[in-house]
Amino acid sequence: MARRVVVTGMSVVTALGSDVPEFWDKLCAGKSGVSRLERFDCSDFKVNFGGEVKDFRPEDHFDGKEAKRLDRFSQFALAGAQKAVRQSGIDFAAEPDPYRCGVIIGSGIGGLNEIEEQHAKLFDRGPSRVSPFMIPKLMVNAASGNISVFWKLKGPSSAVANACASASNAIGDAFRLIQHNVADVMITGGSEAAITPMGLSGFARMGALSTRNDSPESASRPFDRDRDGFVLAEGAGVVVLEEYEHAKRRGAEILAEVLGYGMSSDGSHMTAPDP
């Protein structure tokens, strides 16, 4: 018999706020986190706005050495995981079997910031100046791996790279691992940090982004007749999934229950919906 799966912790790192109640209140009030980008000069770009996380300070979550070994997308993911685990109240050190606790984090692109930084070093200063941490920072599974290491979890640890569906896909996979008795607790969700010169110009060249530079706050309008593209943003969303009886035994507050999950593909085009 399939086991029940519940949510016992959740967190967000977004342009609209990095606290779940604050984020939800602003969302319900119709507020936008989209504004002109500030991390780099994009005055010559076709698009100069996005959903930028402007209040995130790595030093609030990691020491200097640790932060330098994490790409921005992994920083978002680990910071989000810390908050979600804190809300769940779970003590991984007290769990009897660390092989029953795991992580799946989705990311469509991974460490794009690191790729751009090291690419510049390669051509400006030569191959000997490329960081030895480049590969472990840019890998899509860097977020999951670093979360596993942080809590010394020895259960399933993997990543999902499935474009815009990466986080939902990751949560669904984690749900199934618990449902089918492979794990008892999973940290799961998604993280993205593709607001970089290359990321912004690449999506703009695809014709995928809205170009409403004069009204960025109202540019995201996916169901509007006059929509002209999506808005590039960054951030993370992380939840703690837990087997129902496991959560009940430790007296955890149950926030929600995951009842099912499915996947499909139109098999038509990489970016356009099936006409």
For each predicted feature, which ranges?
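Short, high-confidence coil segments that cap the C-terminus of an alpha-helix
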Residues: 182-186
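Condensing-enzyme catalytic core mediating Claisen C-C bond formation in acyl metabolism
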Residues: 4-8, 35, 214-275
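Active-site histidine-anchored catalytic micro-motif
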Residues: 170
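Short conserved active-site loop signatures built around small residues
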Residues: 167
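Active-site-adjacent elements of ketosynthase-type condensing enzymes
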Residues: 42-52, 110-114, 193-220, 262-275
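Conserved beta-ketoacyl condensing-enzyme motif
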Residues: 7, 22, 28-162, 191-200
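Short polar catalytic/cofactor-binding loops
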Residues: 10-17
